[in-house]
Regions:
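A short, Lys/Arg-rich alpha-helix, primarily the initiator
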Residues: 1-22, 27
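Residue-level detection of the helix-turn-helix DNA-binding "recognition helix"
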Residues: 12, 40-42, 51
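Residue at a beta-strand N-cap/secondary-structure junction
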Residues: 18, 44-47
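Residues in the recognition helix of alpha-helical DNA-binding motifs
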Residues: 27, 38, 69
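Recognition helix of helix-turn-helix/homeodomain-like DNA-binding domains
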Residues: 30-45
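DNA major-groove recognition helix of helix-turn-helix/homeodomain DNA-binding modules
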Residues: 48-66
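Short amphipathic recognition helices of helix-turn-helix/homeodomain-type DNA-binding modules
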Residues: 65-75
Length: 75
């Protein structure tokens, strides 16, 4: 059984900083379809994608908070 993650906190941060998913996808060099697959648990985020997304230039997520954005199980 695959673990399903709750990306609601990540989605909120994306909208707060970029206004919509399309602008965010463009900023990280990912298609909207690829981003949608990841946010809907169809494909996992790659470690290097997580590092880039959390960087100060993108979402500025501190290392200590990465777990709550990417690894919170959906209940």
């Amino acid at each position: 059984m695959d673990l399903i993650f709750d990306f609601s906190e990540l989605c909120g941060r994306i909208i707060a900083r970029y206004g919509n998913y399309a602008k965010f996808a463009d900023a990280i060099g990912m298609s909207r379809a690829q981003l949608s697959e990841r946010l809907n648990n169809k494909r996992p985020f790659k470690p290097e994608e997580i590092v880039f997304i959390c960087s100060p230039d993108i979402l500025n997520i501190p290392d200590t908070e990465i777990g709550s954005y990417f690894f919170t199980p959906k209940v």
